[in-house]
């Protein structure tokens, strides 16, 4: 029996990060967490590119653009969608998650889902570096592991 498992080894892997500007006060913390994780695991600044997009809905398009460039070993998608009083939240969350999954499956590279989908601002704050940790950090660690796993399986 063969068991494949990714390790937290980075080598020369290149990472693209797509960050939504809407809810920037939360997303900047997610980005800081992602950058912290990558750097702690030996990724150099020249191995990281960051693209800012207007909102979460635009994340999949730029993730696809990055993935199709063949420059990146993984794409990290960061954003925050907070429930409001209309159904807009449900549509945005659904389309962003589908779009990110679509990019990953069609590009054959890890496209990591670091988009917070919360009921309120307090939950978003908790998940961007306080009580519930920093999801940006967690997603970046997952990206490192997935890059290594993909390399082992090729």
Curated annotation (Swiss-Prot):
Its EC number is 2.5.1.78. The active site is at residue 88. 5-amino-6-(D-ribitylamino)uracil binds at residues 22, 56-58, 80-82, 113. GO terms for cellular component: cytosol; riboflavin synthase complex. Pfam families: DMRL_synthase (PF00885). GO terms for biological process: riboflavin biosynthetic process. It catalyses: (2S)-2-hydroxy-3-oxobutyl phosphate + 5-amino-6-(D-ribitylamino)uracil = 6,7-dimethyl-8-(1-D-ribityl)lumazine + phosphate + 2 H2O + H(+). It is an enzyme of class 2 (transferase). Pathway: Cofactor biosynthesis; riboflavin biosynthesis; riboflavin from 2-hydroxy-3-oxobutyl phosphate and 5-amino-6-(D-ribitylamino)uracil: step 1/2. One of its GO terms (molecular function) is 6,7-dimethyl-8-ribityllumazine synthase activity. Belongs to the DMRL synthase family. This is 6,7-dimethyl-8-ribityllumazine synthase. The lineage of its organism: Bacteria, Bacillati, Bacillota, Bacilli, Lactobacillales.
